[in-house]
């Protein structure tokens, strides 16, 4: 079904619905927007109607007025318009599917290859490494939770900051790039909870840990299978070999299917009839530096010696996925090795820094969860032991205003009960963390405030560990 001269209702203007509604209106559709959560400012709703002709409502609208609905995969199926649509047999497209149809119909993109990356973990790291690798031979635009960047010869240039990774943000990323006359050979999009189906190469980093969406009526892993189920014939899928659900879905796909072994997944979890196409093996070298050995179908293609100064083991999924993708897209081995050996970690993703002369292990990012916080603490404790450091000052929590899926206070409470005594002091960030209790804890309203408090508390031999869920 095309999206031209239709009567459409776009549900959820909070999580990426606004750019979808604007684009559909510009394409000649009669568009209404529904502010499902009632969070959009009335002035903005008025602007959408006055400037773009998009009628907006905070209440459900009659489904019979529309040819089809467009709703996000995370919307509760008990929402009245969705209930009515099912009873009337009305078509409901996901935000991902709608964006895919818009992109496929855009002639400006006909000569540009698209890479889409989804998953639970390692999306941003995989996307960033791949952008660096591709940029050694091609012009690249990268859109991730870190921002919209143009990459050339290994150097990123910021185009725009502040976009989310909802599918609707892809439309803004494309417009902002082309407005500045940046016409890449590759667009790389990090996408939350699924894919649009327009990719020349689709990458699934991980499906675990899984979690409920749509008021816990479905699983995020099922939504992410859009990457596989909507893949274009002739395109390529690069899948985590431990994602059994995705491999099963790919059996009937007309796309080329490749797999990589997730270094964090033990062999017992692999249920493949065939061995993974790509495998990464690691070897500890002098001064605890890691050497990577990259194998394709059992044959070693290259090795790379990694830089110190960050927790390289935390990036192993990204290393193998990005390297495999780069090979598939025509990047030479020399460029891939160069990127891996020059890499020093991404800000907020287990990168080591200094804060006023004190070691800072930075693990604050949009994908941070309680398991990530545990692994970061394990790393900090090992560093403390090996380097004979002092105490650990932990900053833990969320900047809820920026991230939709926050850090559950119950999980934080359990974490502190289990590990709290291993830290001299814990600074809890975010309003919801005030419900969490610990003897050695204090509270901060934001990550910058938490870092300031930690800096004041820490001695020169201490370690500050920052694990806050936020956009960076």
Curated annotation (Swiss-Prot):
The keyword ATP-binding applies. This is Coenzyme F(430) synthetase. Belongs to the MurCDEF family. GO terms for molecular function: ATP binding; ligase activity. It comes from Methanosarcina acetivorans (strain ATCC 35395 / DSM 2834 / JCM 12185 / C2A). It comes from the Archaea. The keyword Cell membrane does not apply. NCBIfam families: F430_CfbE (NF033197). GO terms for biological process: methanogenesis. It is an enzyme of class 6 (ligase). Keywords: ATP-binding, Ligase, Methanogenesis, Nucleotide-binding. InterPro entries: Mur-like_cat_sf, MurCDEF_CellWall_CoF430Synth. ATP binds at residues 119-125. Its EC number is 6.4.1.9. SUPFAM superfamilies: MurD-like peptide ligases, catalytic domain (SSF53623). Involved in the biosynthesis of the unique nickel-containing tetrapyrrole coenzyme F430, the prosthetic group of methyl-coenzyme M reductase (MCR), which plays a key role in methanogenesis and anaerobic methane oxidation. Catalyzes the activation the g-propionate side chain of 15,17(3)-seco-F430-17(3)-acid (seco-F430) for intramolecular C-C bond formation to yield the carbocyclic F ring of coenzyme F430. It catalyses: 15,17(3)-seco-F430-17(3)-acid + ATP = coenzyme F430 + ADP + phosphate.
